[in-house]
């Protein structure tokens, strides 16, 4: 139950990275590291500690696939997304899921590369979370889809978004809300997360950018936003009930997150855009800050953290309305939740 700081450290390019996850205690002492198993390397998109003291992490792996059925080559190099659950104490892989075993390549929105030898990042897994029933929520930027996955079998229980042939929900907008286009809520999205009672939140990038796709891939909706969706499993309806637009009207080609605070506010990290913001439930912008030029953050969180006294605890304190920037993760206890009452910028 002790509070910990977690982060990923490694190398990589274009969102595909290889490295190690670290766990430090409140005295800033290393207490554990987590590595991927089965010959893979941990990617920096996610490191989630579960109530069972296991870690949910992501990895990427390459394979060769026959894509002739979708107009591609017979020997295309592809990049598949992998989820692993790791026993933190032993390093053992307890469970593994590979996107290619469950999702057809035809579901990708990512253009095929010019050469079969150029890896096609068709899925781009970027988040894994726990739903309230203990099953997993997996997000894939390049299929414009979020998946609920059975934690034991790996089967997809339902999917939200993506191509109509496999989307399990009728997508509508509440009064005053605007869809990306008919039947589409998000594009190139990140950070699919359950808020309980059928409420789910996303960071809706609406752009992948030339650097990610090789083409101008800006989607129909003209700016990035944080969105909230209500799922009705009985009627198979997904309703866009709330959205917070990027204050400067910009689109983030990569990264980003949305966090619901205990007070009901929404903290948004704008990813590759050098901003982070906090909104009241009624949409009022409470806080908007900008990093120096050339700096961006994968995610930004408002989290309590009580630093140790002495040299290790230096750093300016701020009022709780100021989000706590963390390079991918933050001050959390071993269940992935915050547990202190002191707020800082890091």
What label would you give each PLM region?
Residues 1-312:
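Histidine-/acidic-rich catalytic cores in large beta-rich domains
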Residues 311-346:
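Ser/Thr/Gly/Pro-rich low-complexity, disordered linker/stalk segments of secreted
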């Amino acid at each position: 139950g002790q509070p910990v700081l977690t982060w990923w450290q490694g190398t990589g390019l274009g969102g595909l990275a290889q490295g190690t996850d670290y766990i430090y205690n409140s005295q800033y002492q290393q207490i554990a590291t987590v590595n991927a198993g089965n010959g893979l390397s941990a990617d920096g998109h996610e490191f989630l500690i579960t109530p069972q003291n296991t870690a949910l992490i992501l990895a990427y792996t390459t394979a060769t696939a026959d894509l002739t059925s979708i107009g591609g080559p017979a020997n295309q190099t592809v990049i598949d997304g992998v989820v692993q659950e790791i026993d933190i104490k032993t390093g053992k892989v307890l469970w593994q899921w590979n996107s290619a075993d469950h999702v057809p390549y035809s579901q990708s929105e990512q253009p095929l590369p010019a050469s079969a030898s150029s890896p096609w990042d068709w899925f781009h897994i970027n988040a894994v979370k726990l739903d309230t029933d203990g099953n997993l929520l997996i997000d894939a930027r390049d299929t414009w889809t979020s998946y609920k996955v059975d934690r034991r079998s790996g089967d997809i229980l339902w999917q939200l978004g993506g191509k109509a042939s496999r989307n399990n929900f009728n997508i509508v907008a509440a009064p005053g809300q605007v869809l990306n286009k008919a039947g589409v809520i998000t594009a190139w999205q990140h950070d699919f997360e359950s808020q309980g009672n059928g409420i789910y939140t996303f960071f809706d990038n609406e752009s992948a950018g030339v650097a990610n796709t090789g083409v101008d891939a800006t989607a129909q909706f003209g700016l990035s936003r944080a969105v909230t969706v209500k799922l009705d499993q009985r009627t198979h309806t997904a309703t866009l009930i709330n959205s917070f637009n990027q204050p400067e009207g910009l689109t983030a080609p990569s990264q980003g997150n949305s966090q619901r605070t205990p007070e009901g506010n929404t903290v948004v990290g704008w990813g590759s855009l050098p901003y982070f913001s906090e909104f009241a439930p009624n949409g009022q912008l409470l806080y908007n800050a900008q990093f120096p030029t050339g700096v961006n953050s994968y995610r930004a969180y408002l989290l309590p953290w009580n630093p140790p006294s002495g040299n290790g605890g230096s750093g300016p304190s701020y009022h709780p309305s100021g989000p706590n920037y963390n390079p991918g993760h933050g001050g959390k206890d071993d269940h992935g939740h915050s547990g202190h009452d002191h707020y800082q910028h890091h």
